[in-house]
Amino acid sequence: MAAALRSAGVLLRDRLLYGGSRACQPRRCQSGAATAAAATETAQRARSPKPQAQPGNRKPRTGILMLNMGGPETVEEVQDFLQRLFLDQDLMTLPVQDKLGPFIAKRRTPKIQEQYRRIGGGSPIKMWTSKQGEGMVKLLDELSPHTAPHKYYIGFRYVHPLTEEAIEEMERDGLERAVAFTQYPQYSCSTTGSSLNAIYRYYNEVGRKPTMKWSTIDRWPTHPLLIQCFADHILKELDHFPPEKRREVVILFSAHSLPMSVVNRGDPYPQEVGATVQRVMDKLGYSNPYRLVWQSKVGPMPWLGPQTDEAIKGLCKRGRKNILLVPIAFTSDHIETLYELDIEYSQVLASECGLENIRRAESLNGNPLFSKALADLVHSHLQSKERCSTQLTLSCPLCVNPTCRETKSFFTSQQL
């Protein structure tokens, strides 16, 4: 057990944070008062009310389950969030996980709580997901009256409302159609795959078939409106750099990294993130030098690289001191944008390296065009009569998780 604890402590140190605003100001330009005000605003936004019922209390016909990992809204929720995360075998496998997971969660809680305090006391991801869902279903009712009324549901893996709780609410509402809509544009077995597995497990464990017809939007890395949103936010942020420096700004597209052991099993995530980056740069006319980098590496084992912080250091050493960070795999702000990118990299690391200007492109958050993208994705999906993407039907060539096969069978067997 001691050896297992030491091993897990190394593998899971410091940055395994999953949770979802503003762009960072140039280095050393934001005052302490401004930082405190921003943190207070983030805390207020994080403690948002639950999603409202369908307007007019009309019985919903089509439900859209918005899938994500979620994030603690208060520091008091951090330990439960971490415990669920460390117990998720779709995300990671540990020795004696039922004992080791809670142990690590308890040990990590104080440090992670302090990081959430630094961003205002909680994650705003639920608030942003609610706003995005509201905008999406409003547009859907206009775009697709024959599948209306539409209602969105939030299904988080590690905080309330949990995926299982959302499914129970959907069953009570008596829906005809249910769309499992991942909020990760790029598919990974550890994110979207874990959420889809949770849907299969729910029905398998309760021992009954769904009363509604399920399908899933399991990836959307190159949707035109998603690409337009990213391009718009990049252009907006580039305008804040000094005019004489603008063309030499290095754009660093930062995505959550993955262990190479997962990648080598055939997880499609790296290719799909790369596809998003290429489409965005094509939209921008390749106006600036750019790289795809990876953040949040944990432990000594090989992960996708280069790491975001190492890339920043390397560029600075080579005289490239104007950098724009773009969170390309996150659509809403959370701990990895607000703390890791905005504080660890844009404040602490930037000061250590001597960067001239570093900014972070705003997350998609409440952008109306992003709500339009979500509505268009669901509308097109409902019209297509597809159960899932063709890619979802293909298991990773070296898959080691038998639940994945059962989940794929669950969705492909639905009679729409």
UniProtKB/Swiss-Prot annotation:
Q: Which PROSITE patterns does UniProt cross-reference here?
A: FERROCHELATASE
Give the catalysed reaction(s), semicolon-separated.
heme b + 2 H(+) = protoporphyrin IX + Fe(2+)
Q: Has the keyword Iron-sulfur been applied to this entry?
A: yes
Question: Residues bearing N6-acetyllysine?
Answer: K50, K283, K408
Cofactor note from UniProt? Binds 1 [2Fe-2S] cluster.
Gene Ontology terms: cellular component: mitochondrial inner membrane; mitochondrion
Needs which cofactor? [2Fe-2S] cluster
Instruction: Give the residue ranges for region: Disordered.
Output: 41-62
Look at the named UniProt entry and state the broad enzyme category this protein falls under: lyase
Cellular localization per UniProt: Mitochondrion inner membrane
Bilayer topology annotation:
Peripheral membrane protein
Q: EC? A: 4.98.1.1
Give the residues the record marks as binding protoporphyrin IX: R108, Y116, S123
Q: Where does [2Fe-2S] cluster bind?
A: C189, C396, C399, C404
Any one of the GO BP annotations: heme biosynthetic process
Alphabetically, the GO molecular function entries are: 2 iron, 2 sulfur cluster binding; ferrochelatase activity; metal ion binding
Q: Which residues carry this modification: N6-succinyllysine?
A: K131, K283, K408
Which residues form the organelle targeting sequence per the record? Answer: 1-47
What is known about what this protein does? Catalyzes the ferrous insertion into protoporphyrin IX and participates in the terminal step in the heme biosynthetic pathway.
Q: How does it assemble?
A: Homodimer. Homotetramer. Interaction with PGRMC1; the interaction results in decreased FECH activity. Interacts with ABCB10 and SLC25A37; this interaction forms an oligomeric complex. Forms a complex with ABCB7 and ABCB10, where a dimeric FECH bridges ABCB7 and ABCB10 homodimers; this complex may be required for cellular iron homeostasis, mitochondrial function and heme biosynthesis. Interacts with ABCB7 and ABCB10.
Q: What is this protein called?
A: Ferrochelatase, mitochondrial
What phylogenetic lineage does the species belong to?
Eukaryota, Metazoa, Chordata, Craniata, Vertebrata
